[in-house]
């Protein structure tokens, strides 16, 4: 039986981050119900035979911005329609400030076994600069909730080369997250995408870019 992975895009969020160029619609709660109804119809239209699902990734946007009932419904349909491996990795992206202990518990009961938490930095000044809705302290609360409800597989996203970010601030963020001992850390370099709020700010010289750049090889300060 051939293996297959599934990605489900949930294009809603509370606020679009300044660097984001993904398809996302901030504060459009009135569209969520119709979107999930259309999504469920599309999933139901697929007829996939002799394929075993080994991974499911629910991304966005901010999937955790939506009421957990939609994610529970989605997971129920995926299980009904497809042959999902017993040990399949099933991930949902969550952002601090959009989840509660109850919502995370709903995810776990629905069969989600991995969280990808968008942190980006442990420096509150930088978080505000790039338009994140949360603080480092809110992330710590979310991380604690995740552990409390029993999530054992947690990824934490961090970003480097943020505007005005220093090497020392990056190292501090890395050390802070490493000390929490998540299963995985994803470290992404900022890309100034065209027509994003951050790209406009830099172009208009309202925001300074980092004074440092990573080399392709031998990054001595990490």
Go through each PLM region and give its residues.
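Canonical Radical SAM [4Fe-4S] cluster-binding loop centered on the CxxxCxxC motif
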Residues: 2-34, 197
